[in-house]
């Protein structure tokens, strides 16, 4: 007859032995890490140095995490809070008196009083784009400097240093605004939503936010988006559209070149018409999604004319569509278009007043 009692005792002993081995192993690890009774002086010093190193490493990791994850977030919140407070501040007579001659938008006087580089205010309804715009002596002044002149990796939204903002309200034909889109999700972070790899999703975003407002000290204006582009800036990738160099048009040919290139390269068509003499607003920010260096997302909008509606009708928004074949640099064509050559233009030449249709247009051009 089996001795069940001995079997139970044997099993219990095995469990106790396993538990004891685990405890001994844990104790051995602890003894190996911290000074213990019976350790030699050299062993104690070694363990102390090791523990200090571990603590220093942990502190360094926490500092790095704070610097790159939490500090930018704090900077964003503090910056936006200060800008909001400044915007809610009623301008004083002294601040208004400091404005340039013929400035009419006195609500911006507090911003100009703090920073004379202030040239306007940019906003897009429904998204986190609602910021002051500055203009430096060059296009690097505000890359890592906030509105108050303090160091910030977020920088500030700034106008091209060669853009003109006259006290008559006149501006350059093409006003270019640059901004970062870092992980803090401010400035131009949401501008990247206009051009994601998921273009259908971006089209829906465009339909919800098709109008940009940019007010200077001398006028208030709205702009209708007609082009959303992915732009290459490196010659090694092939075709480069040097849009930052185009601030004015010497003649109709230069105007036609700029507007037609914007339509050729646009991911979407919104049907906005253009004519020589129109003014444009261009938003430019870095692009990181396609996997190439120095790519840009560029959004171009045409200024609303006198007497024109400053919004799109529901019917117009429904007609927004994707470009069947976007003009891109060689490397993008190789990566995303199976190496196929650009097939030609699918936009309506009537969108540019006086533009002549030629063989580059496809028969399926948009209405």
Segments (PLM) and residue ranges:
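N-terminal membrane-targeting segments
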Residues: 2-13, 18-99
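Solvent-exposed, non-transmembrane regions of membrane-associated and secreted proteins
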Residues: 59-367
């Amino acid at each position: 007859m089996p001795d069940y009692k001995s079997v139970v005792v044997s099993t219990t002993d095995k469990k106790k032995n396993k538990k004891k081995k685990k405890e001994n192993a844990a104790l051995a690890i602890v003894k190996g890490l911290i000074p213990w009774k019976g350790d030699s002086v050299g062993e104690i010093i070694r363990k102390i140095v090791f523990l200090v190193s571990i603590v220093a490493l942990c502190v360094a990791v926490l500092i790095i995490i704070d610097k790159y994850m939490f500090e930018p977030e704090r900077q964003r919140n503090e910056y936006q809070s200060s800008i909001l407070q400044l915007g809610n501040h009623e301008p004083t007579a002294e601040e208004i008196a400091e404005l340039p001659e013929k400035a009419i938008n006195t609500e911006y006087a507090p911003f100009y009083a703090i920073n004379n580089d202030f040239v306007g205010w940019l906003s897009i309804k429904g998204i986190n784009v609602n910021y002051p715009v500055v203009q430096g002596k060059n296009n690097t002044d505000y890359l890592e400097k906030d509105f108050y002149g303090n160091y910030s990796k977020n920088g500030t939204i700034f106008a091209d240093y060669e853009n003109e903002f006259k006290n008559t309200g006149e501006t350059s034909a093409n006003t270019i605004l640059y901004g970062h889109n870092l992980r803090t999700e401010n400035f131009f972070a949401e501008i990247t939503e206009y051009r994601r790899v998921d273009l259908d999703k971006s089209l829906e975003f465009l339909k919800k936010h098709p109008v940009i407002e940019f007010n200077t000290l001398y006028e208030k204006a709205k702009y209708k988006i007609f082009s959303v582009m992915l732009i290459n800036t490196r010659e090694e990738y092939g075709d480069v559209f040097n849009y930052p160099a185009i601030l004015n048009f010497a003649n109709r040919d230069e105007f036609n070149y700029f507007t037609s290139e914007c339509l050729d390269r646009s991911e979407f068509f919104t049907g906005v018409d253009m004519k020589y003499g129109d003014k444009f607003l261009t938003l430019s920010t870095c692009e990181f999604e396609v996997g190439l260096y120095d790519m840009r997302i560029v959004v171009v909008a045409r200024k609303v004319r006198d007497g024109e509606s400053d919004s799109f009708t529901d019917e117009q928004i429904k007609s927004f569509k994707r470009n069947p074949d976007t003009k891109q640099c060689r490397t993008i064509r190789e990566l995303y278009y199976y190496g196929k050559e650009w097939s030609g233009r699918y936009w309506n030449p009537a969108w540019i007043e006086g533009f002549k249709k030629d063989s580059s247009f496809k028969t399926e051009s948009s209405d």
